[in-house]
Amino acid sequence: MLTRLCPAGFLAVLLAVPPAAAADRQAGRQSAAGVCQACHGMDGLSKNPEAPNLAGQIENYLAKALTEYRDGRRQNESMNIVAKELSDADIANLAAFYASIEVEVIPP
């Protein structure tokens, strides 16, 4: 039963976040070139073991996470400080940019 609820719950969370239809990937790239790239890299592949890779991540997930960091509902000292300065448009643009980066996964 739990196996069926988890995917359904995950899908519900993703669908609850409005899509960033009007997001501007180029504006997101410019924003990422500022603070974001220091930890997450311009290519979304972090060199910092404390920071996750963002390349190819689901756009709605990224937008939800950034919104929660900004609003204090998700806690990380660095991210709460950085996200506090982001507007809804900034969040949509960053999420669209990092989600648009294609990643090749090579199985072991």
Regions found by a protein language model. Give the residues of each.
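Residue-level hotspots at or immediately adjacent to binding/recognition sites across diverse folds
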Residues: 22, 42, 82, 97-99
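Gly/Gly-Pro-rich "capping" loops immediately C-terminal to redox-active cysteine motifs
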Residues: 29, 41-71, 80-85
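Bacterial N-terminal signal peptides
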Residues: 6-17
